[in-house]
C-alpha cells in the first residue's frame, strides 16, 4: 500500500509536469501530432483487388486535410516506389498514411525507416472487402492523429496494415 505523503508527492509531480509542458491530457495520451494546416499528406494504398476499400480510405484522408496526394502501389511497380523515394529525400515534412497489404507495408516501412522517417503508428487489421465506412473513418483518423477503434481480427478476411509516418 502506498503511503499517503508519497502518493500526494507523485500526484503533484505529475500535475506539474503537464503544467510545465502546456500539454492537455488528450494530447499527452495520444503522443501523435495531427497534420499541421497546409502540411502535405501522402495517402498510399495497394491495388490488390481494386475494390472500393482503398477509394474510401483516400476519401477519408482527403476530408481531414487540405492537401492530400494519393499514390497507389501496383504490386512491386518501381514507379510508385520511386515517387515515395523522392518524397523521402526531399526537405519538406510530409505525413504519410497508408492502407496496404502486408508485403507492400513491409517495403514502405523499411524505406521510411531507412530514410530517417518516423513511424508514428502501425496496425494490422483483418477486414471485409466492403468495409468502406471503416476505411473512410480510418483515413480521417490517421490524418488527424486521433486514436480510432481497432478492428478485431476476423478469420477469412483480407489482411491490411494501416500506417502513419512522418517523412
Where are these regions (language model features)?
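Long, helix-rich, hydrophobic modules that act as membrane-proximal anchors or helical bundle/coiled-coil regulators
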Residues: 107-108
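Structural motif
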Residues: 44-49, 96-103
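C-terminal segment of N-terminal export signals and the immediately downstream linker at the start
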Residues: 24-63
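A short, well-structured beta->alpha microelement
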Residues: 30-32, 62-88
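Extracellular or exported targeting regions of proteins
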Residues: 75-78, 115-123
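Glycine-rich, aromatic-bearing surface loops/beta-hairpins
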Residues: 119, 123-167
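Flexible, charged surface loops at secondary-structure boundaries
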Residues: 33-39, 86-93
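N-terminal secretory signal peptides and thylakoid transit peptides that target proteins
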Residues: 1-20
Amino acid at each position: 500500500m502506498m503511503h499517503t505523503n508519497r502518493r500526494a508527492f507523485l500526484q503533484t509531480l505529475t500535475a506539474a509536469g503537464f503544467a510545465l509542458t502546456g500539454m492537455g491530457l488528450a494530447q499527452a495520451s495520444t503522443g501523435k501530432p495531427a497534420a499541421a494546416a497546409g502540411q502535405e499528406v501522402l495517402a498510399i494504398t495497394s491495388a490488390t483487388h481494386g475494390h472500393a476499400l482503398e477509394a474510401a480510405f483516400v476519401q477519408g484522408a482527403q476530408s481531414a486535410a487540405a492537401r492530400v496526394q494519393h499514390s497507389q502501389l501496383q504490386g512491386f511497380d518501381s514507379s510508385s516506389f520511386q515517387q515515395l523515394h523522392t518524397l523521402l529525400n526531399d526537405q519538406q515534412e510530409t505525413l504519410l498514411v497508408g492502407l496496404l497489404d502486408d508485403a507492400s507495408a513491409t517495403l514502405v516501412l523499411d524505406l521510411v525507416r531507412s530514410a530517417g522517417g518516423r513511424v508514428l503508428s502501425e496496425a494490422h487489421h483483418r477486414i471485409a472487402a466492403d468495409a468502406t465506412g471503416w476505411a473512410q473513418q480510418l483515413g480521417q483518423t490517421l490524418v488527424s492523429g486521433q486514436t480510432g477503434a481497432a478492428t478485431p481480427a476476423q478469420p477469412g478476411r483480407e489482411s491490411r496494415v494501416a500506417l502513419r509516418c512522418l517523412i
